[in-house]
Every structure is written in structure tokens, then in C-alpha cells.
Design a protein with these regions (language model features):
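Entry/capping segment at the start of metal-dependent catalytic domains
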Residues: 1-3
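Short glycine/serine/threonine-biased micro-segments
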Residues: 6-8, 197
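Extended, well-ordered alpha-helical scaffold/bundle regions in very large, multi-domain proteins
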Residues: 180-220
């Protein structure tokens, strides 16, 4: 995520209602041509760039909402989204994460990817990334996915994430896991983002001592 570019933003505010805002999509370069074009910020002036809203303009409009403390933002592995948006000086707070919710409620029972959870809990088979971006040697990065296909894929992701949240969040109290999520797992999300962004310094000697201590405890 430290190198990923923001290609677009998908949003959903109610089940079945979602949108996708393309920001940096590009058309596939001519066959045999080596495309060393820009990052999609030219607002449609490049012949290989479809017309779309300027990224800075879009983020300026979205920033107040994404940083509004009175509006809960829900994502699946939202740490990834947070890391990318932070590079554009946009924060996301407060947040809920459906991947973390699933892990807290059903750790070890199954995978916690969006596709698997959508099928398992909602009975819905998501569009696969390979269906829109291709597979093998024909796979392209998301910026080269045609806008109509990108819309279907990205908007569905936002829709399914919100639907999963409606299923998972109420279970915290029912399964007596609210304290674990609210006091341990959710507060850890911004901490991990900060650690991955800034890095951490470790004293090798102290780390070795801790490793030895933990090994002894496990042996007991």
C-alpha cells in the first residue's frame, strides 16, 4: 500500500446503493507500445486517459466526510484504505472493519476475505478481480480496467462491505465480544497504520532477550 496509487473511490450508504468515483483510470496502451505515461492526474488530456474527475478536487470534497468524527466509516481491511488516503493527507475516522469483526467473532473457523464472507454470510458471489482485470499474462492493474467494469466491481465491494457490517456488528453484543473488539482490535487499526508508515526501531539485543523469554514461557 505504500506504493499503491489511488485509482478511484467506491462508496455505499445503504444496502443496494453504491457508487464508484474513478480518479486515475487509463486506457490500455496500444499493442506493442510501452506505456510510460503519467499517473492519471491530467484530467483527461492524455489520449490514453478517459475523462474523469480530478483527484485533488474529489479528495477535497470527500475529506470533510471521511474525517467527520460523527460519521462512522466502514471498510473491509480498512487499514489498507487508510494507508493510501494518508498519502494524500486525508484521514478516515472513526472506522469499523468488517474483516476484523469477522476475525473477532469467528477466528479460525474460516477465511475472512470479502469474497468468502459475502458468499458465506450473504449468499452472494462477488465479481472476482480476475473477471475484470484478467488473469496470468493478460492481467492488468486496476487503472487499466474499463470504467464500466471497474464500476461494477468496486461498487459491489462497497455494497457487500456495508451489508456484512449490518450482519456482523450486532453480533458483538450477542456473542459477548464487544469488549474485545472495542478495546483491543479496533483501536489497534490506526496504531498499525502509523507503525507501517513510520516504521519502528528495535534494539537487536533486547529483541533477542524477549524472544528467549517468550520461548521459555511457551515451553512451560
Amino acid at each position: 500500500s505504500m506504493r499503491a496509487e489511488l485509482v478511484g473511490v467506491s462508496l455505499s450508504y445503504d444496502a443496494g446503493k453504491a457508487c464508484y468515483i474513478p480518479l486515475a483510470h487509463r486506457m490500455v496502451a496500444p499493442q506493442g507500445a510501452l506505456d510510460l505515461g503519467g499517473d492519471g492526474d491530467d484530467g483527461g488530456t492524455d489520449q490514453n486517459t478517459p475523462e474523469q474527475i480530478d483527484r485533488d478536487t474529489a479528495l477535497a470534497l470527500l475529506k470533510p466526510l471521511l474525517e467527520d468524527p460523527s460519521v462512522l466509516k466502514v471498510g473491509h481491511n480498512i487499514k489498507y484504505d487508510t494507508e493510501i488516503l494518508a498519502r494524500y493527507d486525508v484521514g478516515i475516522t472513526p472506522v469499523d472493519d468488517t474483516m476484523v469483526l469477522s476475525y473477532v467473532l469467528e477466528a479460525g473457523q474460516h477465511g475472512h476475505g470479502l469474497d468468502e464472507l459475502s458468499l458465506r454470510m450473504l449468499g452472494h458471489a462477488n465479481i472476482k478481480f480476475g473477471d475484470v482485470a484478467g488473469v496470468g499474462k493478460k492481467r492488468v492493474t486496476f487503472e487499466y480496467v474499463p470504467l464500466d467494469r471497474a464500476l461494477d466491481y468496486a461498487a459491489e465491494d462497497a455494497d457487500m462491505t456495508l451489508r456484512l457490517h449490518d450482519v456482523l456488528k450486532p453480533r458483538l453484543a450477542r456473542d459477548h465480544m464487544a469488549t474485545v473488539y472495542e478495546t483491543l482490535e479496533r483501536p489497534l487499526i490506526p496504531v498499525l497504520v502509523a507503525m507501517e508508515s513510520a516504521g519502528i526501531k528495535v534494539a537487536p539485543g533486547h529483541l533477542k532477550t524477549l524472544s528467549t523469554d517468550f520461548t521459555k514461557r511457551l515451553d512451560k
